[in-house]
C-alpha cells in the first residue's frame, strides 16, 4: 500500500433516465450474469409500480427507504484471547448505503410474488413506511450493537 497518495473513491455514473447515482448502484447490485438491461428493466418496473401504488415520486420513496434501512452501526466478530466478541463498529456512508442496498434486494428476493420488479417495488414501499424485512434487519443489527456495547473498546 503506497503512502504517497490515497486512492480515489470509485463513483458510479448516474443512470440515463433518473440521472441518479443511487439507482445505478441498485442496478449494479441487481445485476446477475452480466444482464444489465434486465436489471434496468427490473428496477424501472419497480419504480413504475411504486408510482402506480403510492401516487408519489418513486425517487423520493427510494430515498426514504434507503434512509430508513441504512444502518448506523454494525457488529463485527473479533477474536481476542481465544474468545470471539461481537464488537460494534460505526458505519461510513458508502458502506451503509451498500448494506442497505444489499438488505433491500435480499428482502425483495425472498418475498413471495410474481416477478422481481413488483417484489422490489413493494419492499421499497414497505421500507419507506418503516416496516418490512430490510428495516427489521437494520433494527436487529442495532439491537446487537447495543447489546454488545460493552465490547466497543476492542475496536
Swiss-Prot record:
HAMAP family: Ribosomal_uS7_B. Belongs to the universal ribosomal protein uS7 family. It is found in: Plastid. Keywords: Plastid, Ribonucleoprotein, Ribosomal protein, RNA-binding, rRNA-binding. The keyword Metal-binding does not apply. GO terms for biological process: translation. GO terms for cellular component: plastid; small ribosomal subunit. It comes from the Eukaryota. The gene is rps7. PANTHER family: RIBOSOMAL PROTEIN S7 (PTHR11205). The lineage of its organism: Eukaryota, Viridiplantae, Streptophyta, Embryophyta, Marchantiophyta. NCBIfam families: rpsG_bact. PROSITE patterns: RIBOSOMAL_S7 (PS00052). This is Small ribosomal subunit protein uS7c. The keyword 4Fe-4S does not apply. Part of the 30S ribosomal subunit. GO terms for molecular function: rRNA binding; structural constituent of ribosome. One of the primary rRNA binding proteins, it binds directly to 16S rRNA where it nucleates assembly of the head domain of the 30S subunit. SUPFAM superfamilies: Ribosomal protein S7.
